[in-house]
């Protein structure tokens, strides 16, 4: 069942959430991802964005979004599949895979998961144009719902899920 997307409108959370910090470290330990950024009070990277308009505030401003880089695409795909299979348990609101190239496409426009479209693969949209803004980028963008009471609560949910 689809969940309401929690970050429209976005807001300034003032700092990185301890949940997101723990998640980034866990992604590093398990798959070697690197932290490319969590909290940043800025406008979205979107050609339509109007600087200073709250409608265009990046989800990174909430402290609940992160960009995690990788060097091995095969490992990134394993991580994508695992996260996608557990969007409900981990309360993942959104994931962007910028390097995904759809069959028959001439460019890697990416794909995105959003909780309001459904859980797991039901919530994935394959991009056919520059909608995500970073085609071919070697990182995942992940947004976690701000409903976790603590990093410890999130950690327990993570550890309850079998490793891939």
Question: Which residues does each PLM region occupy?
Answer:
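Active-site or metal-binding loop neighborhoods of secreted/extracellular toxin and effector enzymes
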Residues: 116-164
């Amino acid at each position: 069942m689809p969940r309401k997307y929690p970050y429209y409108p976005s807001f300034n959370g003032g700092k990185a959430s301890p949940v997101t910090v723990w998640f980034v470290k866990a992604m590093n330990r398990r798959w070697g991802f690197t932290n490319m950024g969590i909290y940043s009070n800025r406008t979205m990277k979107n050609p339509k964005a109007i600087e200073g308009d709250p409608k265009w505030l990046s989800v990174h401003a909430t402290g609940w979004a992160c960009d995690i880089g990788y060097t091995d695409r095969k490992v990134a795909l394993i991580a994508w599949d695992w996260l996608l299979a557990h969007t409900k348990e981990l309360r993942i609101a959104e994931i962007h895979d910028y390097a995904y190239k759809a069959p028959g496409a001439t460019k890697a426009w990416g794909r995105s998961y959003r909780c309001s479209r459904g859980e797991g693969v039901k919530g994935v949209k394959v991009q056919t144009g520059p909608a995500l803004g970073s085609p071919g980028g070697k990182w995942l963008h992940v947004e976690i719902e701000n409903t976790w009471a603590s990093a410890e609560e999130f950690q327990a949910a993570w550890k309850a899920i079998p490793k891939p």
